[in-house]
């Protein structure tokens, strides 16, 4: 189905963003109405953004994290541009999807997981803040990240996914910890076993810096993970490979579309006004994380950050 390409959006509010991971390059459960490419100070997003309507008539913005042809390595995903583009459209919450490896016997391939915590095993290759990187003139800001996922939306997403899949032979887990590794190679067996001793329950290559940047952008963020394999910690079985991952994802297409249909409209009800906790609890949080005095912030940094936060350094 072809949709018109637009240069700006003046239609109904787009409060919800959806980021698709491996195997999820489009959503069959929503109706595309337009496509838009947004230029940000940090470049272009991974893919053109599809503006679509849910079954309840709510407009959402969808982008494919690795591009529509899955041509972008995890370490090379333009995370800043992705988050900034969604913020520019007015997005207040993001529901992100990701394929993950399981580090626990009870989390079987094809199960869904709504994690609550993250262990960062990326290696400093990926830029993880809008406020500076490397030799760039920076602004010192320390966003709170103790609870990396929105604690208002996370239990709602969990209960919605659980209810949606109640008649399916698929378990739904929550209060789990996701390890984010650098990749693109999968774990060694020693690493996989180590992550288990650290308290890791699932593992992927994508949740960071995505979740950190969403926090800096004051966007509520929640992850829906689909287990595809048992990583490499089980000594009696073969280590994970791409064929196994893709087989699990294909088998879960129906469940993923069912989940999407229900979750998006349910989350919308929690963000449709600024007084709802999911929005209110994060709004203006960035203002209180900045330590650099506005009068010494470089003009270029001010210009870039105002794309994200129009109020930035105007005093």
UniProtKB/Swiss-Prot annotation:
The record marks 187, 242 as: Important for substrate specificity. InterPro entries: MTAP, Nucleoside_phosphorylase_d, Nucleoside_phosphorylase_sf, Purine_phosphorylase-2_CS. Belongs to the PNP/MTAP phosphorylase family. MTAP subfamily. This is S-methyl-5'-thioadenosine phosphorylase. It is found in: Cytoplasm; Nucleus. NCBIfam families: MTAP. PANTHER family: S-METHYL-5'-THIOADENOSINE PHOSPHORYLASE. Its main location: cytoplasm. Catalyzes the reversible phosphorylation of S-methyl-5'-thioadenosine (MTA) to adenine and 5-methylthioribose-1-phosphate. Involved in the breakdown of MTA, a major by-product of polyamine biosynthesis. Responsible for the first step in the methionine salvage pathway after MTA has been generated from S-adenosylmethionine. Has broad substrate specificity with 6-aminopurine nucleosides as preferred substrates. GO terms for molecular function: mRNA binding; S-methyl-5-thioadenosine phosphorylase activity. Its EC number is 2.4.2.28. It catalyses: S-methyl-5'-thioadenosine + phosphate = 5-(methylsulfanyl)-alpha-D-ribose 1-phosphate + adenine. Substrate binds at residues 205, 229-231. Keywords: Cytoplasm, Glycosyltransferase, Nucleus, Purine salvage, Transferase. Signal peptide: none annotated. It comes from the Eukaryota. One of its GO terms (cellular component) is nucleus.
């Amino acid at each position: 189905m072809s949709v018109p390409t637009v240069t700006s959006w003046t239609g109904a509010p787009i409060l919800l963003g959806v980021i698709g991971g491996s195997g999820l390059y489009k959503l069959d459960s929503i109706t595309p109405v337009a496509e838009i490419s947004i230029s940000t100070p940090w470049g272009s997003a991974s893919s053109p953004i599809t503006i679509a309507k849910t079954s309840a008539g709510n407009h959402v913005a969808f982008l494919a994290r690795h591009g529509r042809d899955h041509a972008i390595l995890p370490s090379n995903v333009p995370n800043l541009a992705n988050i900034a583009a969604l913020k520019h459209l007015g997005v207040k919450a993001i529901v992100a999807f990701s394929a993950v490896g399981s580090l626990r016997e009870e989390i079987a391939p094809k199960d869904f997981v709504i994690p609550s915590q993250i262990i960062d095993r990326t290696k400093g290759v990926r830029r993880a803040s809008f406020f500076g990187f490397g030799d760039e003139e920076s602004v010192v800001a320390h966003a709170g990240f103790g609870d990396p996922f929105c604690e208002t939306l996370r239990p709602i997403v969990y209960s919605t996914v659980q209810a949606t899949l109640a008649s399916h032979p698929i378990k739904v887990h929550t209060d789990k910890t996701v390890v984010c590794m650098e990749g693109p190679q999968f774990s060694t067996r020693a690493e996989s076993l180590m992550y288990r001793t650290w308290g890791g329950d699932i593992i992927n290559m994508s949740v960071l810096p995505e979740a950190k940047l969403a926090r800096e952008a004051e966007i509520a963020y929640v992850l829906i993970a689909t287990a595809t394999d048992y990583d490499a910690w089980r000594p009696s079985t073969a280590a994970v490979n791409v064929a196994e991952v893709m087989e699990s994802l294909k088998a879960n297409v129906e469940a993923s579309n069912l989940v999407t249909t229900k979750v998006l409209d349910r989350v919308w009800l929690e963000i449709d006004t600024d007084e709802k906790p999911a929005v209110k609890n994060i709004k203006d949080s960035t203002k209180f994380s900045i330590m650099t005095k506005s009068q010494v912030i470089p003009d270029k940094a001010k210009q870039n950050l105002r794309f994200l936060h129009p109020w930035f350094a105007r005093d």
